[in-house]
Amino acid sequence: MVFFYLQIMNNLIPEKIICITEETTETIYLLGEEKRLIGISGFTKRPKIAKKQKEVVSTFLDADIEKIIELEPDLVIGFSDIQSSIAEKLIKKGVTVLINNYRSISGIFKMIYNVGCLVGKNEASKDLINEIKNKHKQIANNSSKWKKKPKVYFEEWDNPQISGIKWVSEIIHLCGGNDIFIEHSKESLAKDRIISSNDVIKKNPDIIIASWCGKKVKKEKIKKRNGWEKIKAVKNNEIHEIKSEIILQPGPASITDGVELIHEIFSNWYKRNIVS
């Protein structure tokens, strides 16, 4: 009976999956089930080999609907209400679509587990989640011993200036920092996280981390903003860039490499400013 049940379950696992967003592609590769992937987003950078192996069928805001239909996927996976128009077009064509819609670290863990279940890797996804959580505990334990926590401004875009989304704010906290715009982080849409230069000057962050959604961060441009020469982070040359495919990807990248990079920035700041 167990064998029969597993056979039924295996028959339900989608054999042909298209990911129109990067984080699920990386998750499927991490789980060793990339053979199921037949199409991916053109923005995919993790793993690097993915774009050499898989058909590119979308950007983030647009998709080649006809190409997707021609590939005859069992399932298309996307992210958030921002991709709702793509999902609607595909659904009208009879394509099965799964849209993940979360903005938190816990949401990322749920996505990893759900994708694991979809591809028949329940236990492997649990192992991956536990491995990441254990690393988080080590980092949180280390930073909890600090006598002072840095005030941090995360800039998601430069014009207009946009502060960090929820999972970024949570990573800042996890790594031992205080997000100076934590009250905005709960807003899922970037337009609701627009802040002014004066807001940043008043809050006077110790550290600035910028990630401009795929655009190269220009540190000198940040330094030359009117009045920003007064900010501690500018005076002490604590302006850092993290690539958007790492920290702004709501998936494994942000909660692994993103966490490690931010913790390293904070640790170095602490050693320079607090440890005698």
Segments from the language model and where they lie:
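N-terminal ligand-binding lobe of clamshell/alpha-beta domains
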Residues: F3, I8-S276
